[in-house]
Design a protein with these regions (language model features):
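Conserved class I S-adenosyl-L-methionine
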Residues: 30, 34-88, 185-213
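Class I SAM-dependent methyltransferase SAM/SAH-binding core
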Residues: 92-143
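A conserved beta-strand element that flanks and buttresses the S-adenosyl-L-methionine
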Residues: 155-156
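A short glycine-rich, Lys/Arg-flanked "PGG" loop and its adjoining helix->strand segment in the class I
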Residues: 170-182
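Short alpha-helix
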Residues: 214-229
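Conserved S-adenosyl-L-methionine
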Residues: 231-242
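Core SAM-dependent methyltransferase catalytic element
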Residues: 244-265
Length: 265
C-alpha cells in the first residue's frame, strides 16, 4: 500500500521503516471491489492491517521527506514534464501506493491531475485530510479498478516492495500497462539488494507491531520484467542513500514508456 518509512518514505528494510503496496481497486487476482474489500490475498490483508496500524507514525516520518531527496524530486519533475509534453497540461496520472499523499501532492503542484491509490484505508483517509483537493481511493495495484487507458502515466514510488512473488510483480505491471494510455510513462522506484533479489520480514516498524515482508530488487531483473510487460525502458538509475535522511539502502529507478497491445499477465 504505502511507501516505506524511516527518514524516507520508502518502505522496507531489515527491521522496518515502512512500506506498502499501493494500488487501486480490484479487478484481477481475486481482489474484491474495494470500497469495502470483502477478500484480499492473506499477505495483502497483512499489509493493509500493518499500515492501518502504523499510519500516525508513518505520516510523521515521511510527510516532508521529498524536501531532503533532491534526486527523487528531480526524477518526479522529469516524469511530470515528459507526461505533460506528451499529453498536455493537467494530464492524469496514478500514484500507486500513495500512502499519505505527499508524492501525489508534489506531482499535482507540477500541474498533473493525480489519483492516489493505496491498500490501507487509514492511509487514504489521512491523505484525503492532508490534501483535500486531490483524489484518493483504496485499492490494490495488482487489480486496478480503473478503465483501460485511464491514465497518461503512473508512478510506483517505493510501493511494489511488498509484492514478494514474481507473479504479483507481473500482475501489477500488467495492470499498469492496461491502465496507462499508449506512450504514457511509468516510473518505478525500489530498494536494491546487495546480492540481487531478496526478501526480509519485519515484525516492527516505527515502534509499531506489524507483519510485513519487504522485497529488495535486482534492477536488471525488474527492468526486464517491465520491458516484458509491454514498456520500452528509457532510463535506469541507481543511487546511494542520503545519510541521516532515509534507510541506508541503495535505490533503483526505472522510467519506461508504454508501447504495444495489452497482454494479461
Amino acid at each position: 500500500m504505502t511507501r516505506a518509512a524511516e527518514g524516507d518514505e520508502e518502505r522496507q528494510t531489515h527491521r522496518v521503516d515502512a512500506g506498502g503496496e499501493g494500488a487501486s481497486g480490484p479487478r484481477a487476482h481475486g481482489v474484491a471491489k474495494i470500497a469495502g474489500v470483502e477478500r484480499l490475498p492473506e499477505h495483502q490483508a497483512r499489509v493493509r492491517v500493518s499500515y492501518d496500524a502504523v499510519t500516525d507514525a508513518y505520516v510523521e516520518r515521511v510527510h516532508d521527506e521529498l524536501s531532503h531527496k533532491p534526486l527523487d524530486r528531480a526524477l518526479l519533475t522529469a516524469f511530470a514534464e515528459q507526461v505533460q509534453d506528451q499529453f498536455g497540461a493537467g494530464a492524469s496520472v496514478c500514484d500507486a501506493g500513495c500512502g499519505p499523499g505527499h508524492v501525489a501532492a508534489f506531482l499535482a503542484a507540477l500541474g498533473l491531475t493525480v489519483t492516489g491509490i493505496d491498500l490501507s484505508p487509514a492511509m487514504v483517509t489521512r491523505a484525503t485530510a492532508l490534501h483535500p483537493d486531490l483524489s484518493f481511493e483504496v485499492g490494490s495495484m495488482t487489480a486496478l479498478s480503473a478503465a483501460d487507458g485511464r491514465w497518461q502515466g503512473a508512478i510506483a514510488f517505493y510501493s511494489i516492495i511488498h509484492l514478494t512473488s514474481d507473479e504479483e510483480i507481473r500482475a501489477a505491471l500488467s495492470e499498469f500497462h492496461r491502465t496507462i494510455a499508449n506512450h504514457g510513462l511509468l516510473l518505478v522506484a525500489v530498494h536494491l539488494g546487495e546480492h540481487g533479489d531478496a526478501t526480509v520480514h519485519a515484525d516492527e516498524m516505527l515502534g509499531v507491531p506489524v507483519a510485513l515482508e519487504f522485497r529488495f530488487f535486482d534492477l536488471e531483473w525488474l527492468a526486464g520484467e517491465i520491458a516484458a510487460a509491454g514498456f520500452q525502458v528509457e532510463a535506469r538509475l541507481v543511487r546511494t542513500p542520503y545519510p541521516g535522511v532515509e534507510v541506508q539502502t541503495t535505490r533503483g529507478y526505472v522510467l519506461a514508456r508504454r508501447v504495444g497491445e495489452h497482454v494479461a499477465a
